[in-house]
């Protein structure tokens, strides 16, 4: 039987002052342990895997916090996350390359751009894994009789209307978050 492991609220940032994730070694070792499960393992990151919402983006050498959550900025932020948390990315890659293992992401309020296909493709490239090893479940996970969603969907201030999660603004696709 396939094992299911769920992790939430890691909030890995870009290694700057807003990044308070300091558990690279512990998380890497945990993921390394999961890759050996008999029958395979599905690792589910149930929201806030990354903390893109608090990360600045460098534009012309200046750190800015864009109000609009566009895919280009999110991809730049994920590049910084990988640089800051390389051991975790390595562990996820090795986990996914094992037969029977798979990875699932649920969108959280700290990483709302994960709903965007361009950001998803970029993350898969950064992880160095085959696309068929990862599922982007959107705002909820329903499988094996299990239902998961990130807690922000029950918070009046952070709940996202899933049918309005992405829109266009001046030719740019943006992810919605209720705080803007």
Give residue ranges: language-model regions.
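Extended recognition/assembly regions associated with phosphoester-bond processing machinery
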Residues: 1-180
């Amino acid at each position: 039987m396939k094992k299911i492991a769920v992790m939430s609220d890691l909030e890995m940032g870009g290694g700057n002052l807003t990044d308070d994730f300091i558990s690279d070694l512990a998380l890497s070792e945990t993921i390394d342990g999961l890759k050996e499960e008999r029958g395979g393992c599905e690792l589910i990151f149930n929201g806030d895997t990354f903390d893109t919402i608090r990360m600045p983006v460098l534009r012309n050498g200046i750190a800015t916090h864009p109000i609009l959550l566009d895919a280009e900025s999110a991809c730049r932020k994920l590049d910084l996350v990988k640089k800051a948390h390389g051991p975790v990315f390595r562990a996820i890659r090795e986990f996914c390359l094992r037969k029977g293992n798979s990875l699932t992401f649920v969108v959280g309020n700290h990483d709302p751009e994960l709903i965007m296909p361009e950001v998803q493709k970029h993350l898969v490239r950064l992880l160095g894994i085959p696309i068929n090893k990862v599922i982007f479940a959107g705002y909820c996970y329903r499988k094996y009789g299990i239902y998961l969603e990130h807690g922000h969907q029950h918070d009046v201030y952070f709940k996202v209307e899933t049918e309005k999660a992405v829109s266009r603004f001046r030719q740019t696709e943006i992810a919605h978050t209720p705080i803007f």
